[in-house]
Design a protein with these regions (language model features):
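Terminal accessory carbohydrate-recognition/targeting modules of carbohydrate-active enzymes
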Residues: 1-207
């Protein structure tokens, strides 16, 4: 496997950063993909597009995770997204903290601030509709708090969603959060964590 590595000089602006893209496949028709800076710019991008009946019926079920890190009274957002507001496109530019992107069959991001740095790793399990995302604090205050906001969906990977189509039955058991789409109650999207606690939040939509 060839390793590809890029640094900040390769994404001097948000628009430059979405010109290069990556993809990882799971061997049964499912995949993950996004831009080099982690901002989605196409309907078929996300952390897990699952093939419900391999190798067809591809559905986006897990879009991404937005991250904020709090140290003391300071909170930094690493969200990298584009939104429509007041008739124009606005950007959240977490890529300004991104110092390294590596693709070696899996995906590795390195983020740095004046006070801390961390790595984010994304990969898919072979022959299964499973995505693993890992975070590793590599420098700074070990007492910092990571807040992870996962974004879920349930749509055919070339279609678009509207708020009225994003309806789920949700519940939590042990360290697992379950989402059952109203459009297909025969499946369940499961989100598991190795540590931390689940917190209620307002509904958030992303493009």
């Amino acid at each position: 496997m060839i390793t590809y590595q890029y640094t900040q000089k390769d994404w001097t602006t948000f628009k430059e950063g979405i010109k290069r893209e990556w993809a990882v496949t799971n061997g049964i028709g499912g995949y993950a993909g996004s831009s080099m800076i982690g901002a989605h710019s196409r309907t078929h991008q996300g952390y897990l597009i699952a093939s419900l009946h391999a190798p067809i019926e591809r559905y986006l079920v897990f879009s991404k995770i937005n991250v904020t890190v709090t140290v003391g009274t300071s909170t930094v957002s690493f969200e990298t997204s584009q939104h429509r507001a007041s008739g124009k496109t606005v950007y959240t530019e977490g890529q300004k903290f991104l110092t390294s992107f590596i693709y070696d069959g899996s995906v590795h991001y390195t983020y740095e601030t004046d006070n801390f740095s961390f790595e984010k790793h994304i990969t898919l399990k072979r022959n299964a509709n499973v995505c693993a995302v890992a975070y590793e604090l590599t420098a700074g205050d070990s007492d910092c708090t990571f807040t992870l906001t996962p974004l879920f969906n349930y749509r055919e990977h070339s279609e678009s969603s509207t708020p009225d189509t994003l309806k789920f039955e949700t519940f939590t058991e042990d360290r697992t959060f379950y989402l059952v789409p109203e459009k297909n109650k025969d499946i369940a999207i499961r989100f598991q964590t190795s540590e931390g606690t689940f917190s209620e939040r307002e509904t958030v939509y992303d493009i």
